């Protein structure tokens, strides 16, 4: 499946990729791994990661997805401080129903209301 992705997805970090059923991140980590080949600094890593997005329904899968992203980065780079990278990961990879997601504002459209009376 990944063979069908355009090659510039890996080299042009302005290209956005969203996995609507991210699972534990197999596809996202593959794309990230290919992008990391063109990174030389933490800033490059953040740029490569900042246009990757994933939505997954199962919370435990999202936790594993985020760990897999960190592990993918650690296989290629020695990172001492993950704060900036974690900010991107926590913002871009979310637990939600893909069909109830507002992509323009990157937030859930599911409205829950609590009765006031």
Where are the predicted features?
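SAM-dependent methyltransferase catalytic region
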Residues: 2-117
């Amino acid at each position: 499946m990944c063979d069908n992705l355009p090659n510039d997805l890996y080299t042009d970090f302005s290209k956005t990729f969203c996995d609507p059923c991210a699972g534990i991140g197999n596809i996202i980590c593959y794309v990230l791994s290919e992008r990391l080949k063109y990174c030389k600094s933490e800033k490059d890593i953040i740029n490569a990661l900042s246009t990757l997005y994933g939505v997954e329904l199962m919370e435990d899968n999202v936790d594993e997805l985020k760990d897999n992203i960190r592990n993918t980065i650690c296989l290629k780079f020695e990172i001492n401080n993950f704060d900036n990278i974690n900010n991107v990961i926590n913002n871009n990879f979310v637990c939600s129903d893909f069909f109830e997601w507002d992509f323009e504002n990157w937030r859930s459209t599911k409205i829950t209301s609590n009765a006031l009376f």
